[in-house]
Every structure is written in C-alpha cells, then in structure tokens.
C-alpha cells in the first residue's frame, strides 16, 4: 500500500534494505560469547562459522528477491550496513542476487552504501552535503529531525531550513533523501508533516527550478545557486533567516550570455 500510494503521486520507489539483521539468529545469537569481538555484527566470526554464515546469506538473498519481485517496479535498492561486505569478511554475495533480480527489474539502480564497486551506482553522503559538485551520481541522506529513528519531542528542521538544504544539494547536482522516523503507530509526526508541507508549498511555486534540472556553472557563488533546464538558467537565492535583509538589487554571478531575466513566480521581466 505504501509503495502504491507513492506511485499514484508519480514518485519512484527506492526500497531500503539493511544487510545487517539483528533479529535473525543466523546473524545475531543472544547466547554467543563474544569476548573481545565487539563489531556491530554478526555475533560470531563468519570464517569460524561458515555454515551459520551460509544460513544468513540464504536468508538475506531470499529477502532481496522478495523485495525485488513482489512489490512492483523499483527504481533502486538502497543497501545499508556497509560493514557487511567481502572486504570485511562478511560476503552475502550481493552480485549474484542483484544480477538475478535485474532480469525482473532491468533498470534498477543499486546503492551498496560505502562499499564501492559495480553495485554502488551512486554514493550517499550521510548527514552532510558536499562542498562542491561531485563527478559521480550522489544523494545526501539527512534526517528531518535529530535521529534516523523516532524520538518523542524531537526537534524538526523548519520548512525554511529544509528548503535551503534542498536547494544547496540540487545546485551541486545531488538528490536529497530526507529521513522521517514514524511514530510507534506508523503515523508521521505532526512536526515532520508541518516541515514537509512547508517545503511542498515552496516547491509548488519554485519547483520548476528544482525538478528535472542539471547543474550549471558556477554552481553556487556569493550565496546564489544555479540550475538549468530546457535552455533556461535558474538563479536561486535562499535566506536562512526571516530577518535577513533583502536588497532591491541583486548581483547574479553568472558569466554566460542571456537575453532576459524573469522572476519565476510572477513571470515578470526584470530590469538588468
């Protein structure tokens, strides 16, 4: 139902999957004597327990198959827990299952986070935004509140903060994956809803400068970011505070040629 609700709004689906699973005993055994072995998991050394690890690999691959074949079209699968990787002695043989499910989902991207290689099709900086545009596809994953999970009385970013964050990412060529931890009853917290609705209202007016755009030099300079689409260049100036002064005239540091300047919302020519 969740996936279908997003699809009805024209939003593509990227399914989240944690490669680590502390709820299955083939990964985490409560009675394991770990000694000095203090990694985030598994609770045993795979090289010392190959049969147990193979049980976990089978379980994990079956879950990936289920996600990729039972819920309609997926644009991407987003794999968390980067320490579960061959380089760390925790090989779930992701390549073989991804190649298998891509026969069903031929256009599906794969984000094997922080692992690198052919199955990290885009990188996912966490809780940060790169200073400059990157030469590879990227998507910042950032919490709307202070935690990836739900917290009572959490403090959420204001609509203005989220809008400034989104603009900063898009002008550098990235996407924003914004995290909202649902309440125990499954609902989205009211504070998060207010922030997202505020961003939605802004996008309803200014989304033309965001959706489907590409980066445009000088990307971001003197507080103004640039995007481009369909022969148009968009200059985006954001203000982190309601009290920041707004000048009557704005210097736009764009070196390319242009014929006219239009205010996006008012569709009115500006003098320049």
What are the roles of these predicted feature ranges?
Residues 1-272:
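Mature catalytic domains of secreted/periplasmic carbohydrate-active enzymes
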């Amino acid at each position: 139902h969740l996936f279908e609700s997003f699809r009805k709004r024209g939003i593509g689906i990227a399914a989240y999957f944690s490669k680590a699973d502390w709820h299955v005993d083939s990964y985490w055994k409560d009675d394991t004597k770990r000694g000095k072995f203090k990694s985030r998991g598994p609770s045993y050394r795979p090289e010392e327990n190959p049969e147990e690890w193979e049980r976990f690999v089978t379980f994990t691959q079956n879950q990936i198959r289920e996600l990729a074949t039972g819920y309609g079209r997926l644009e991407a699968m987003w794999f968390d827990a980067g320490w579960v990787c061959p380089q760390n002695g925790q090989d779930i043989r992701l390549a073989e299952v991804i190649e298998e499910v891509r026969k069903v989902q031929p256009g599906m991207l794969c984000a094997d986070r922080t692992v690198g290689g052919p199955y990290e099709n885009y990188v996912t900086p966490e809780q940060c935004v790169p200073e400059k545009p990157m030469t590879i596809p990227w998507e910042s994953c950032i919490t709307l509140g202070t935690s990836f999970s739900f917290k009572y009385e959490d403090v959420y970013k204001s609509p203005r903060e989220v809008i400034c964050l989104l603009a900063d990412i898009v002008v550098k060529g990235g996407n924003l994956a914004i995290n909202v931890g649902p309440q125990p009853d499954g609902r989205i917290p009211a504070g998060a809803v207010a922030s997202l609705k505020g961003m939605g209202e802004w996008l309803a007016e200014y989304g033309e400068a965001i959706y489907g755009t590409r980066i445009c030099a000088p990307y971001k300079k003197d507080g103004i970011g640039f995007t481009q689409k369909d022969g148009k260049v968009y200059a985006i100036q954001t203000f982190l505070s309601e009290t920041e002064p707004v000048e009557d005239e704005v210097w736009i540091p764009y070196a390319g040629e242009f014929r006219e300047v239009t205010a996006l919302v008012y569709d009115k020519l500006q003098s320049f």
